[in-house]
C-alpha cells in the first residue's frame, strides 16, 4: 500500500470514528403548518386536531420540495461521501437527521436557513387482570357494543421494540372479520426470512427505523432484526396491554393464570419499531417513527420510551426535536400517552414534561401473589410465588445449596444462586426442597428465578426456596411463574428465621460437612392471586413531580404526571426470543412492571373514548380522563404511595398530585365527563411564550412560529389541573370549560386548599347549554410560607350527576 493511499484510509477511518448523528431543524413550515407563501406551493396546513391528508397532491409536492431543500443544503456545504443523511422530517417538523462530524455540525449551525442543530441522544424503555380492575367488561365495553367492538376502527401506533406477529393476542378475527380502514395508510414490511408480511387485519402497519442506531454502530442485525420483529419482548407486551385480543388463555408451565385482554381489544395495531434489545434507541429514529405514524393516520400514539438525558443544546424541557415532533402530532389530532419514567420515588424524576403529552404514572392494582413456607417447627413464613404447592399433609427435607455441592471449588460460581445444576449432588437434592440465596445477581439480571426452577427440576427437587439475607433500597421482588413448588422469602427477618431453624436442625461433623439433614418444610399454593382493597397505590418506581421547565430543574407551572394507571405486575404477550426480562426467555407471556406498562393502559382507554367521541381533540380526551379520575382507593381511603422510610424500608405515605397527577383512571366515567378543558395548538404556543426562561427565538427555532400568543402566565394554560410554582401574594388563574353532555346542566364550583394558601373561585355556579363554553377563575393567596407545596382541588358538581375535579398545587413565596 503506497503512502498516499495509507493516509487516505486513515483519514476515512478518523471521519467514521468522529462522525455522529445530529438532528437539524430548518426554516420553513412542515406539512402540518405550511400556510402557503413559497412560490409554486399551495398551503398544506391543517386546522388544529385535524389529520394530514397524505393522499393529497399538494402534500406530496410540498414534501418533495422540503426533502430537496434538505439535500440541497447538505450538498452545498459538504463534499459527497463526507456525510450521510439518515432521514428527512417533513410532516411534523421541518428538518433532517444526518451523520456528520462535529465540525460539519458547526458549519450547519451557522448556515443560512438552519434553525437548530441537536446532537442525537439515546432513549430507553420504561419497563390480564387489569380490565376487570378498571371495570371495562361491565361498565365500558358494553357501551361500545361489547368487547367485540371495543376500539373498533381506532388505530393505536406503538413506537417501541416491534411486535411478535404470531402471538394469539394479535391474531385476526375470523368470527367477526375486520372491515376496511380508509383513514390509515401505513405500510407493512415483510419478514426478510419468510417473505411474509408482518400484518394481518389486526396489525395494519409494521415498519422499523434504525438508521441512527446503525450510524452509531449500535445495531446488530443478528439480535436486533432489520424488520419489525420484536427482539426484546417490550413492544409486544405494550401492544397487547393497549389493544390485544380479548379472552386469550394465559397459560404457562401447564397452568392457566386467567385470560388476557387489551384495554381496547378491537383497536388496530400499527407498529413503528425504533427500540432495540441492548441499547434502547436514538431520538433520530424515534422522531422518524413518530413522523411516519402521524403521516400514516394513527389515532393514538403509545410511547413507553423516555430520554436517557437531555440534548446538550436544549435549554428547556419542552423544546427539542422529540417534544416538538409530538406537538406536531397533537396538532394533527393524535392523542399521545407517554410513560412518566421509572426514577421514583424521588422528586423531579419525570422524563415526560410537555402539556400536549399525557404523562402516565404507574399504580399497583388489587392483585398480590402470596405464598407461604411451613417449617417443621410449626412456624409459617410468608413470601411470594406463582407456583403449585408441595403434596398436602407432607413435609419435605430442606437442603441448602451450599451443603449439596459436588466440589467446594465451585464456590467461584456463587452456587447459592442455584443457576448451574451440574455443580450439585443430585442424590442429596432429589425429592427434597432446595434452599437458594437471592443475591445481587438477581437484581442486575445475571441470575434469574427461571434458572433456579430449571436447576431444581433437573436435580429432581420437590421444590425450592429463595432466601433474601440482605436487601438494598430499590430492590424489586416480583413473583415468577414456576412449574414446580417454589417461594421467595423477601423479608430478611423471616429469612433469618428459616436459616436459624435450618442450622439448628442440621447435624455437621467437625469440618462443617453435613452428617444429616433434619430441617423440614412444605410450600403452599401460590397460583391464585389474593385481591385486596388497599388499591390502587402509587408504585415505588413510578417517577414523581414536580415537573421541571429546564435542566437546572427549575419548577414548571404545569402539573406532571397527569394520570395514574396500572403498571405493576401486568400480564401480557411476550415474544419467545425476548430478552428484556430473563425470567421470561422463551415464554409467550410475561408478568412485568414499569410505567412502560401504565402508558398503554391509557392509550387503550383513550381509544375507547375516541371511539365514542370521534371528533374530540387530544386535549378533550386527556381532560375527560383526568377530570373523572379518582383519588380514593377501593377501601374508601385517600390514595397512598410507596415511599422509603428513614430506615430505607418501603412504606406507604399519603400520595399527592406529584405522585398521581389528577388521580387513578376511571374509564367508565371518562366516557361521559360532562365538562372538558379543551386546548389546541395556539394554546400550547401561548404556554411556551409565557413560560419564563424560554426565549421567543428558541420557540421559533422549533415551531417556526412567532410569539403572538400571550396568556399572561403559564398557569393560565387551560389544563385540567392548576400549578403555580412561585406564588407571591395573590394570583388569579382562569379556566374555560365546555359542556359536552347532551343536556343543559348547572354546576356548583367549590375549592379547597391546605391552610398555608387561601383559595376562592368565581363564579360559585354556572349553567351551560350543550356545547356552550364558560370561564371561571381561581384566586390563591399566600397565608404563610412553609417552603413546601400546598395541595388542593377545584370541584364542579353538576345538577345532572356529573362530577368534575382538577388538582391544584402551589408553592408560596415571600414578597
Swiss-Prot record:
Domain Peptidase S8 residue range list: 120-671
Positions of glycan attachment: 503, 577, 701
Positions annotated as active site in the UniProt record: 160 (charge relay system), 234 (charge relay system), 596 (charge relay system)
Source taxon at top rank: Eukaryota
Membrane-spanning segments: none
CDD domains, sorted: PA_subtilisin_like, Peptidases_S8_3
Gene Ontology terms, MF aspect: serine-type endopeptidase activity; serine-type peptidase activity
GO biological process: proteolysis
Expression by tissue: Expressed in roots, leaves and flowers of mature plants.
Domain PA, residue spans: 397-501
Signal peptide (from-to): 1-19
Keywords: Glycoprotein, Hydrolase, Protease, Serine protease, Signal
InterPro entries from the UniProt entry: C5a/SBT2-like_Fn3, PA_domain, Peptidase_S8/S53_dom, Peptidase_S8/S53_dom_sf, Peptidase_S8_Asp-AS, Peptidase_S8_Ser-AS, Peptidase_S8_subtilisin-rel, Peptidases_S8_3
Chain ranges of the Inhibitor I9 domain: 21-124
EC number per UniProt: 3.4.21.-
Entry's Gene Ontology cellular component terms: membrane
Description of what induces expression: By methyl jasmonate.
Family: Belongs to the peptidase S8 family.
UniProt cross-references to PANTHER family, sorted A to Z: PROPROTEIN CONVERTASE SUBTILISIN/KEXIN
Annotated protein name in UniProt: Subtilisin-like protease SBT2.5
Organism the protein comes from: Arabidopsis thaliana
Amino acid at each position: 500500500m503506497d503512502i498516499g493511499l495509507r493516509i487516505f484510509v486513515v483519514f476515512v477511518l478518523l471521519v467514521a470514528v468522529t462522525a455522529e448523528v445530529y438532528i437539524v431543524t430548518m426554516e420553513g413550515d412542515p406539512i402540518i403548518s405550511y400556510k402557503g407563501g413559497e412560490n409554486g406551493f399551495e398551503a398544506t396546513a391543517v386546522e388544529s386536531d385535524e389529520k394530514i391528508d397524505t393522499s393529497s397532491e399538494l402534500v406530496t409536492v410540498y414534501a418533495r420540495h422540503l426533502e430537496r431543500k434538505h439535500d440541497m443544503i447538505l450538498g452545498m456545504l459538504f463534499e459527497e461521501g463526507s456525510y450521510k443523511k439518515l432521514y428527512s422530517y417533513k410532516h411534523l417538523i421541518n428538518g433532517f437527521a444526518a451523520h456528520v462530524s462535529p465540525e460539519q455540525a458547526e458549519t450547519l449551525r451557522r448556515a443560512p436557513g438552519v434553525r437548530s442543530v441537536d446532537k442525537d441522544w439515546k432513549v430507553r424503555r420504561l419497563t390480564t387482570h387489569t380490565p376487570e380492575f378498571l371495570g371495562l367488561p361491565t361498565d365500558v365495553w358494553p357501551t361500545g357494543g361489547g368487547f367485540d367492538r371495543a376500539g373498533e376502527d381506532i388505530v393505536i401506533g406503538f413506537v417501541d421494540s416491534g411486535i411478535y406477529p404470531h402471538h394469539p393476542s394479535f391474531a385476526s378475527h375470523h368470527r367477526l372479520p375486520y372491515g376496511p380502514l380508509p383513514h390509515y395508510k401505513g405500510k407493512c414490511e415483510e419478514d426478510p426470512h419468510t417473505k411474509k408480511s408482518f400484518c394481518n387485519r389486526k396489525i395494519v402497519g409494521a415498519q422499523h427505523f434504525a438508521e441512527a442506531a446503525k450510524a452509531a454502530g449500535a445495531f446488530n442485525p443478528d439480535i436486533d432484526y432489520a424488520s419489525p420483529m420484536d427482539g426484546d419482548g417490550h413492544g409486544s407486551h405494550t401492544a397487547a396491554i393497549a389493544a390485544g385480543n380479548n379472552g386469550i388463555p394465559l397459560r404457562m408451565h401447564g397452568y392457566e393464570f386467567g385470560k388476557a385482554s387489551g384495554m381496547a381489544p378491537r383497536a388496530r395495531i400499527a407498529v413503528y419499531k425504533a427500540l432495540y434489545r441492548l441499547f434502547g434507541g436514538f431520538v433520530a429514529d424515534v422522531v422518524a417513527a413518530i413522523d411516519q405514524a402521524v403521516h400514516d393516520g394513527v389515532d393514538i400514539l403509545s410511547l413507553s420510551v423516555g430520554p436517557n438525558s437531555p440534548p446538550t443544546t436544549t435549554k428547556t424541557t419542552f423544546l427539542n426535536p422529540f417534544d416538538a415532533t409530538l406537538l406536531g402530532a397533537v396538532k394533527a389530532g393524535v392523542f399521545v400517552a407517554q410513560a412518566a419514567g421509572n426514577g421514583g420515588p424521588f422528586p423531579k424524576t419525570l422524563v415526560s414534561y410537555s402539556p400536549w403529552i399525557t404523562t402516565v404514572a404507574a399504580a399497583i392494582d388489587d392483585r398480590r401473589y402470596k405464598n407461604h413456607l411451613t417449617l417443621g417447627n410449626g412456624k409459617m413464613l410468608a413470601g411470594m410465588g406463582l407456583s403449585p404447592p408441595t403434596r398436602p399433609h407432607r413435609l419435605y427435607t430442606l437442603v441448602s445449596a451450599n451443603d449439596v455441592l459436588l466440589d467446594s471449588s465451585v464456590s467461584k460460581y456463587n452456587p447459592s444462586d442455584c443457576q448451574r445444576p451440574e455443580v450439585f449432588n443430585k442424590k442429596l437434592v432429589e425429592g427434597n426442597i432446595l434452599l437458594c440465596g437471592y443475591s445481587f445477581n438477581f437484581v442486575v439480571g445475571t441470575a434469574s428465578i427461571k434458572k433456579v426452577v430449571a436447576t431444581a427440576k433437573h436435580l429432581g427437587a420437590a421444590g425450592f426456596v429463595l432466601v433474601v439475607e440482605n436487601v438494598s433500597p430499590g430492590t424489586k421482588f416480583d413473583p415468577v411463574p414456576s412449574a414446580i413448588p417454589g417461594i421467595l422469602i423477601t423479608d430478611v427477618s423471616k429469612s433469618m428465621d428459616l436459616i436459624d431453624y435450618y442450622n439448628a436442625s442440621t447435624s455437621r461433623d467437625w469440618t462443617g460437612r453435613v452428617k444429616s439433614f433434619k430441617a423440614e418444610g412444605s410450600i403452599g399454593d401460590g397460583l391464585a392471586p389474593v385481591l385486596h382493597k388497599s388499591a390502587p397505590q402509587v408504585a415505588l418506581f413510578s417517577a414523581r413531580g414536580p415537573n421541571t421547565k429546564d435542566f437546572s430543574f427549575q419548577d414548571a407551572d404545569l402539573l406532571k404526571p397527569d394520570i395514574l394507571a396500572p403498571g405493576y405486575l401486568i400480564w401480557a404477550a411476550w415474544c419467545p426470543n425476548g430478552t428484556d426480562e430473563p425470567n421470561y426467555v422463551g415464554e409467550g407471556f410475561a408478568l412485568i412492571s414499569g410505567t412502560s406498562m401504565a402508558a398503554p393502559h391509557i392509550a387503550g382507554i383513550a381509544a375507547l373514548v375516541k371511539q365514542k367521541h370521534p371528533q374530540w381533540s387530544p386535549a378533550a380526551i386527556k381532560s375527560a380522563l383526568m377530570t373523572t379520575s379518582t383519588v380514593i382507593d377501593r377501601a374508601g381511603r385517600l390514595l397512598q404511595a410507596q415511599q422509603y422510610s428513614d430506615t430505607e424500608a418501603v412504606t406507604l405515605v399519603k400520595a399527592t398530585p406529584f405522585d398521581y397527577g389528577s388521580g387513578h383512571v376511571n374509564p367508565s366515567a371518562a366516557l361521559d365527563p360532562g365538562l372538558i378543558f379543551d386546548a389546541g395548538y395556539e394554546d400550547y404556543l401561548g404556554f411556551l411564550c409565557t413560560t419564563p426562561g424560554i426565549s421567543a427565538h428558541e420557540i421559533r427555532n422549533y415551531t417556526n412560529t412567532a410569539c403572538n400568543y400571550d396568556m399572561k402566565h403559564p398557569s393560565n394554560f387551560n389544563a385540567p389541573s392548576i400549578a403555580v410554582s412561585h406564588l407571591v401574594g395573590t394570583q388569579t388563574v382562569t379556566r374555560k370549560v365546555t359542556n359536552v353532555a347532551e343536556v343543559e346542566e348547572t354546576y356548583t364550583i367549590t375549592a379547597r386548599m391546605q391552610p398555608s394558601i387561601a383559595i376562592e373561585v368565581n363564579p360559585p355556579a354556572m349553567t351551560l347549554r350543550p356545547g356552550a363554553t364558560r370561564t371561571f377563575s381561581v384566586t390563591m393567596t399566600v397565608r404563610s410560607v412553609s417552603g413546601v407545596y400546598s395541595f388542593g382541588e377545584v370541584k364542579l358538581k353538576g345538577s345532572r350527576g356529573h362530577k368534575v375535579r382538577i388538582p391544584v398545587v402551589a408553592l408560596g413565596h415571600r414578597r
